[in-house]
C-alpha cells in the first residue's frame, strides 16, 4: 500500500502569500514574498511538529493545523462580512476571536478523538490546497509573460528627441530648489468649491517662504504612478505604451522614469546637488541619479506587503497598535 503524501498544511500556509502577491503583482516586486513565505513555512512546520508530538498522529496533526490556518487567514474576511457589511455585534474582535478559537478547539478535539477516515480527509484537503495554489497561476502567469522591465538606457531611447536641446541658464547665485508634490491634494479653488475648506493660510505660508504655488494646475493623469513621472519629466508619457504595451497593467514600468527623471538630470548637469526625499511610496524610494535619497524607516515594499498579510489574519487585532507604530 502506497503511503499518502500530506502537503495541505504547507499549501494552506503559502496560499495567502501567493494570493496577496498575485493581486498586487503589477505594483510590487517578487522580492517581497520571500520573508513572509519563510515566516509562514517556519510557523506551519512548528505547529505541525507540536501537534504531532501531542497527539502522536501526523495525519491528524496535519488536519488540525490546516483547520487552524484556514480560520486564521479568513478571519479578516469574516470580520468584514459580519461587522462592516452587516453590523452584527458578534463580528467585533472581542467576540469573533473567541468564536474562532472555540470553533477551532472543538474541531481539533473531534479530529484527535473521533475522526476515523484520516486518509480521505487529508486527500480532500490536499486537493483543495492545490486548487487554491493553481488559482493564483493565471495572474502570476500573465505577469511573468507580459512584464517588460525598462532599463535606464532605454529611458533615454524612448523619449522624444528634444531632450538633448534643453539648456538651463542659471544666475550667479542660483537658489535652492524644493519641488514639493502633494499627491492627491486638491488645489485651493476646488477645495473651497467641493469641500468648503479654505486653505489660504497654508498657501500664503508657502508663498511667504518664496515658493511658487501653481494655483490652477491640474494633473496630467489620475494615478500617482503616471502623474509623478509625467511631472518630473515635463511631458506626457503615453509613449510608454510602445514599450510595455498599451494594455499593460505594470505599475512598476513607470518607476525608472521617476528614478532617472529629466528634471533631476537637467539640474545636475548645471551643478546642482540632487536630494530626493521619499514619501514612503515605493516608486520614490530609489533613485538612479540622486546624490542622496532619504527614505522613511520601515516604509519599504517588503514591510508594506508583510503588514497587509498580517491584516488578513486573526492576530491583527492583537498586534494592531504595534503594527501601526511600525508603519509610521
What is the predicted role of each segment?
Residues 10, 181, 185:
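Active-site His/Glu-centered metal-binding helix of metallohydrolases
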Amino acid at each position: 500500500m502506497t503511503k499518502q503524501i500530506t502537503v495541505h498544511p504547507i499549501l494552506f500556509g503559502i496560499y495567502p502569500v501567493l494570493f496577496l502577491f498575485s493581486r498586487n503583482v503589477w505594483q510590487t516586486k517578487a522580492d517581497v514574498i520571500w520573508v513572509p513565505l519563510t515566516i509562514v513555512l517556519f510557523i506551519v512546520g512548528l505547529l505541525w511538529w507540536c501537534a504531532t508530538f501531542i497527539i502522536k498522529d501526523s495525519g491528524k496533526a496535519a488536519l488540525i493545523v490546516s483547520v487552524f490556518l484556514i480560520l486564521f487567514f479568513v478571519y479578516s474576511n469574516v470580520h468584514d462580512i459580519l461587522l462592516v457589511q452587516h453590523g452584527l455585534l458578534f463580528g467585533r474582535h472581542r467576540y469573533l476571536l473567541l468564536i474562532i478559537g472555540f470553533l477551532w478547539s472543538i474541531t481539533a478535539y473531534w479530529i484527535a478523538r473521533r475522526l476515523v477516515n484520516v486518509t480521505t480527509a487529508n486527500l480532500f484537503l490536499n486537493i483543495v490546497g492545490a486548487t487554491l495554489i493553481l488559482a493564483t497561476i493565471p495572474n502570476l502567469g500573465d505577469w511573468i509573460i507580459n512584464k517588460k522591465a525598462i532599463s535606464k538606457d532605454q529611458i533615454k531611447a524612448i523619449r522624444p528627441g528634444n531632450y538633448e536641446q534643453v539648456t538651463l541658464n542659471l544666475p550667479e547665485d542660483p537658489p535652492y530648489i524644493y519641488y514639493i508634490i502633494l499627491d492627491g491634494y486638491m488645489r485651493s479653488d476646488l477645495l473651497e468649491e467641493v469641500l468648503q475648506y479654505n486653505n489660504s493660510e497654508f498657501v500664503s505660508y508657502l508663498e511667504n517662504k518664496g515658493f511658487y504655488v501653481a494655483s490652477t494646475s491640474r494633473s496630467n493623469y489620475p494615478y500617482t504612478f503616471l502623474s509623478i513621472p509625467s511631472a518630473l519629466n515635463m511631458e506626457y508619457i503615453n509613449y510608454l505604451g510602445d514599450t510595455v504595451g498599451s494594455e499593460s497593467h505594470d505599475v512598476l514600468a513607470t518607476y525608472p522614469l521617476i528614478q532617472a527623471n529629466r528634471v533631476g538630470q537637467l539640474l545636475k548637469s548645471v551643478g546642482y546637488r540632487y536630494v530626493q526625499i521619499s514619501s514612503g511610496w515605493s516608486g520614490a524610494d530609489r533613485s538612479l541619479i540622486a546624490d542622496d535619497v532619504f527614505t522613511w524607516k520601515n516604509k519599504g515594499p517588503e514591510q508594506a506587503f508583510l503588514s497587509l498579510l498580517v491584516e488578513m489574519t486573526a492576530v491583527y487585532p492583537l498586534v494592531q497598535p504595534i503594527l501601526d507604530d511600525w508603519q509610521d
